[in-house]
């Protein structure tokens, strides 16, 4: 039911209306052009609305109309391969309607209401169904079978069910009480979709990035943050995760970042192959583009839209990864709206409820048993852009309280052209211990001890670097000079990775293990040679060390690795034979 009021005051994206009988978070059409807005505060007769479109030119006295429903997204077949703005308007539809520049007050359906999908029922007349039950399937892409579920708040007995080609708005099932079900369902973005139970994450998200998988793994259903200063590689890391992580669905939210970065994703993803299925990456991806020049209020909507779409696919029993780049821009939008509302500012001007909003978002991640009995997961990876790389600022600190994995990007590493520029001394993962059994069973029994040894060596190196800067490496004992050489190999061969190299961009677990084991084998053999009296200068000159550095770029990895290991054995045998 539509309720009319009128505009009383306009302050940037915040509009005050009077005479509008609306509820909190109701969707409102603002002004003569019908701009999309959402009720965020009610003060007696005044209703405060945040508007998701540019408010220039609207004035007091213009009408405000409440739609009576909250901001919702359309969920159903056709989400994959789509690119939306922050409020689920398909950008290709907006392009057809008005060209390259988006005008205001234009609405578009989130899903294509005319496209036909082949619906195959898996229930029959007379069956009882409840919220979350699967009534049929649609082949959405070659690899994704889309399960059509009963909306969570509906239950009953089936009186009629159809089979064949239908659009998402056609009635495919009728219950005895007259309720009609379509392939599409609408869901309010601020309300988490219900689940039977939340479960403990026990499987790692395989990213193909050696430093993440090897040293700081995130579990499927986990939460991770990538904070870092400008130019340290947040977006490239996020895009690498979106390209190569082993989840069935990827939701990528460009929240307040540069438009060119979204353009990169759009140009690259259709050409790249998913390493798990061999299909184009775009077939498993939903993109939400809310760039820095779009209205700030829509940044909040884009984050909630993305997580709601992710929850929908999780309910089908799929593993979903969600990349939000960057949550700092969302926090800045909250700060702007909060100041327009004249609320009491918290630290650095951010609203006092900043941590509550961030927690609300990250807590929607996790492994869950859905209402239909399937187990799915949402892994949320949020980039944070602290001004000047200051990790003590409120957004980073509040994020760190919530997430369990911290990948700290370091400007000094990026200046040295060490990418990914993740500082191995500042980063951590709280999922390590719970994933150790998986690594022992699926990678190698000695993988975890190898990883711990590598971390100890890297920490010892950082302590030795202080002495080296004072007196030089030649003043160190021979065993410590050799340790510095082994850790240099760890950094340059194992931790460094080229995100733009056709082979090195994605490193499977067995390759990661073999590279790490080869470096450790070289280090152990070098230490044995040193103890038997071989000078450290002779050991450092060995050619196998340089050949090992090139193995990660080889397409025939196993052949190259076996050749290097044979060369290594030969060189150390000749050293000992002198």
UniProtKB/Swiss-Prot annotation:
Its subcellular locations are:
Cell membrane
Instruction: Please tell me whether the keyword Nucleotide-binding is annotated for this protein.
Output: yes
Question: Which keywords annotate this record?
Answer: ATP synthesis, ATP-binding, Cell membrane, Hydrogen ion transport, Ion transport, Membrane, Nucleotide-binding, Translocase, Transport
> At which positions is ATP bound?
228-235
Give GO cellular component annotations, separated by semicolons: plasma membrane; proton-transporting two-sector ATPase complex, catalytic domain
Alphabetized GO MF terms: ATP binding; proton-transporting ATP synthase activity, rotational mechanism; proton-transporting ATPase activity, rotational mechanism
Q: Which InterPro entries match?
A: ATP-synt_VA_C (IPR055190), ATP-synth_a_Xtn (IPR031686), ATP_synth_asu-like_sf (IPR023366), ATP_synth_asu_arc (IPR005726), ATPase_a/bsu_AS (IPR020003), ATPase_F1/V1/A1_a/bsu_N (IPR004100), ATPase_F1/V1/A1_a/bsu_N_sf (IPR036121), ATPase_F1/V1/A1_a/bsu_nucl-bd (IPR000194)
Which transformation does this protein catalyse, written as a reaction?
Answer: ATP + H2O + 4 H(+)(in) = ADP + phosphate + 5 H(+)(out)
Q: What biological processes does GO assign it?
A: proton motive force-driven plasma membrane ATP synthesis
UniProt cross-references to Gene3D superfamilies, sorted A to Z: 2.40.30.20, 2.40.50.100, Bovine Mitochondrial F1-atpase, Atp Synthase Beta Chain, Chain D, domain 3, P-loop containing nucleotide triphosphate hydrolases
What's its EC?
Answer: 7.1.2.2
Q: Which domain of life is it from?
A: Archaea
Q: Which PANTHER family match?
A: H(+)-TRANSPORTING TWO-SECTOR ATPASE, V-TYPE PROTON ATPASE CATALYTIC SUBUNIT A
User: Main role?
Assistant: Produces ATP from ADP in the presence of a proton gradient across the membrane. The archaeal alpha chain is a catalytic subunit. Component of the A-type ATP synthase that produces ATP from ADP in the presence of a proton gradient across the membrane. The A chain is the catalytic subunit.
Query: Matching NCBIfam families, A to Z?
Result: ATP_syn_A_arch, PRK04192.1
Describe its partners and assembly state: Has multiple subunits with at least A(3), B(3), C, D, E, F, H, I and proteolipid K(x).
UniProt lists the family membership as follows: Belongs to the ATPase alpha/beta chains family.
Which protein are we looking at? A-type ATP synthase subunit A
Q: Which organism is it from?
A: Methanosarcina barkeri
């Amino acid at each position: 039911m539509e309720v009319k009021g009128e505009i009383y005051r306009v302050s940037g994206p915040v509009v005050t209306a009077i005479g509008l009988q609306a509820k909190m978070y109701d969707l409102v059409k603002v002004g003569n052009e019908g701009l999309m807005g959402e009720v965020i505060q009610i003060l007696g007769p005044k209703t405060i609305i945040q508007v998701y479109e540019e408010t220039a030119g609207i004035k007091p006295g213009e009408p405000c109309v409440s739609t009576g429903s909250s901001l919702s997204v359309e969920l159903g077949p056709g989400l994959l391969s789509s690119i939306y703005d922050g409020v689920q308007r398909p950008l290709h539809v907006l392009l057809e309607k008005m060209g390259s520049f988006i005008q205001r007050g234009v609405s578009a359906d989130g899903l294509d209401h005319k496209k036909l999908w082949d619906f195959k029922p898996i229930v029959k007349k007379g069956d009882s169904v409840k919220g979350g039950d699967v009534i049929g399937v649609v082949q959405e892409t070659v690899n994704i079978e889309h399960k059509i579920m009963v909306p969570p708040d509906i239950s009953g007995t089936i009186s009629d069910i159809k089979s064949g080609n239908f659009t998402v708005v056609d009635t495919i099932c009728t219950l005895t009480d007259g309720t009609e079900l379509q392939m599409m369902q609408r869901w309010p973005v601020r309300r988490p979709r219900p689940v039977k139970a939340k479960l403990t994450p026990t499987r790692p998200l395989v990213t193909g990035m050696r430093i993440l998988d090897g040293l700081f793994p995130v579990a499927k259903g986990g939460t991770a943050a990538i904070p870092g200063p400008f130019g340290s590689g947040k977006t490239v890391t996020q895009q690498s995760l979106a390209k190569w992580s082993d989840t069935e669905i990827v939701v990528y939210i460009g929240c307040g970042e540069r438009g060119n970065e979204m353009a990169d994703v759009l140009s690259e993803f259709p050409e790249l192959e998913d390493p798990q299925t061999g299909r184009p990456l775009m077939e498993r991806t939903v993109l939400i583009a809310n760039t820095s020049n779009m209205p700030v209020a829509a940044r909040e909507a884009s984050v909630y839209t993305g997580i709601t779409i992710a929850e929908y696919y999780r309910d089908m029993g799929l593993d979903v990864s969600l990349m939000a780049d960057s949550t700092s821009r969302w926090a800045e939008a909250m700060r702007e709206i909060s100041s327009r509302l004249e609320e009491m500012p918290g630290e650095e001007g951010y609203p006092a409820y900043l941590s509550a909003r961030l927690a609300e978002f990250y807590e929607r991640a996790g492994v869950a048993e859905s209402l239909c009995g399937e187990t799915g997961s949402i892994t949320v990876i949020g980039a944070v852009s602290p001004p000047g790389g200051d990790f003590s600022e409120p957004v980073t600190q509040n994020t760190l309280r919530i997430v369990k994995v911290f990948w700290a990007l370091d400007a000094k590493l990026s200046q040295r052209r060490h990418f990914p520029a993740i500082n191995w001394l500042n980063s951590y993962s709280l999922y390590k211990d719970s994933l150790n059994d998986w690594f022992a069973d699926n990678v190698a029994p000695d993988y975890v001890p190898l990883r711990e040894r590598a971390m100890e060596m890297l920490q010892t190196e950082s302590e030795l670097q202080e002495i080296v800067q004072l007196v030089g490496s030649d003043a160190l004992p021979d065993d410590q000079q050799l340790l510095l050489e082994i850790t240099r190999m760890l950094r340059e061969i194992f931790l460094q990775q080229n995100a733009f190299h056709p082979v090195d961009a994605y490193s499977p677990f067995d390759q990661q293990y073999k590279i790490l084991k080869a470096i450790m084998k070289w280090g152990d053999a070098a230490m044995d040679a040193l103890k038997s009296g071989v000078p450290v200068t002779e050991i450092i000159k060995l050619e196998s060390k340089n050949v090992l550095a090139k193995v990660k770029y080889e397409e025939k990895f196993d052949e190259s690795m076996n050749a290097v290991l044979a060369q290594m054995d030969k060189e150390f045998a000749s050293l000992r034979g002198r």
